[in-house]
Structures are given as structure tokens and as C-alpha cells.
């Protein structure tokens, strides 16, 4: 599929043209991922001629709203699976995502649009990992509150004995 976003048609980088499984028997497929879900099918695949023109985002606000939703789902899902992160890892994953999109996937060849999409990918990745970091901090803070409450209750009830 060819991706169109923000008034640009992308040929490289994070929005480079990709292949998407579209026609399949529903009883022979299962779905992977909660964000950017995709069908997985073990049947032989055939590539059809031509492209699907995919018009994804018209504006920064539209992207921001969708990114906010997807990053929350990603963080909650990964937190439930036991994944943890640090602030340094948040930045490292984001920087790697930018470099992968802009340099390894040749986003720089698309000029301004390649830089734009690569920076957006940096922000998107940072949002994912910061939300994961936030979830683990909230859980740690709750645990500390429970421990302090338990300690306080022990003190109160020991004094009454």
C-alpha cells in the first residue's frame, strides 16, 4: 500500500509502502497485536498487482489523538505482560526509532516529509515508553502506600495490645 499523510506521499521511512494481507478465509486466520493488529495466516500468499492508496492522517491533531489512544493500549498491554522500562530506555528506544526511520529506512530521501514522519515516530515511541514508565511508577507508589498503611496499622494495633 502507498501511504499518504499530512499532504505527503511517502516512499521511504516509517511510512514506506508496505504489504498488507487483505483477502483471507476468516476461519484460517488469527490476529496479532492490539495496536496495529494484523491477520496471520499460514496459507500460501499471492501478491496482487498495484497498490492500495492509504490516506491515513490529514492533520497533526488527528495523528495526536490516534497516537494517544494507541500508545495507551500498547503501554497497558505491555505492562500486563510484565514489561518494564526506565527513563533512559524511553529515550534510547525513541532515538533508535528515529534513526531507524530516518537513516536505515531512508526517510531522509523523502526530504521534509521524511524528517517530519521520523520525528513523529520519535514522539510516538517516547509516548509509549513514558506511559509504560508511568504505569509502573503508579503501581510502585500504590505498593508503597499499602506497605506504609500496613506498617501504620501494625503500630496502632500493637499499641492497643
Which stretches of residues belong to each language-model region?
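Catalytic-site signature of metal-activated, phosphate-bearing donor transferases
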Residues: 1-139, 146-148, 156-158
Amino acid at each position: 500500500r502507498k501511504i499518504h499523510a499530512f499532504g505527503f506521499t511517502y516512499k521511504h521511512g516509517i511510512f514506506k509502502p508496505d504489504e498488507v494481507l487483505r483477502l483471507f478465509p476468516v476461519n484460517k486466520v488469527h490476529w496479532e497485536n492490539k495496536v496495529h493488529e494484523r491477520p496471520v495466516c499460514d496459507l500460501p500468499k499471492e501478491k496482487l498487482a498495484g497498490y492500495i492508496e492509504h490516506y491515513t492522517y490529514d492533520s497533526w491533531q488527528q495523528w495526536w489523538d490516534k497516537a494517544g489512544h494507541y500508545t495507551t493500549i500498547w503501554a497497558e498491554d505491555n505492562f500486563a505482560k510484565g514489561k518494564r522500562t526506565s527513563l533512559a530506555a524511553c529515550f534510547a528506544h525513541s532515538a533508535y526509532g528515529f534513526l531507524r526511520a530516518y537513516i536505515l529506512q531512508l526517510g531522509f530521501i523523502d526530504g521534509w516529509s521524511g524528517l517530519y514522519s521520523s520525528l513523529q515516530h520519535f514522539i510516538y515511541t517516547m509516548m509509549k515508553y513514558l506511559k509504560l514508565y508511568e504505569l509502573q511508577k503508579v503501581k510502585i507508589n500504590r505498593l508503597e502506600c499499602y506497605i506504609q498503611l500496613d506498617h501504620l496499622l501494625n503500630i496502632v494495633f500493637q499499641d492497643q495490645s
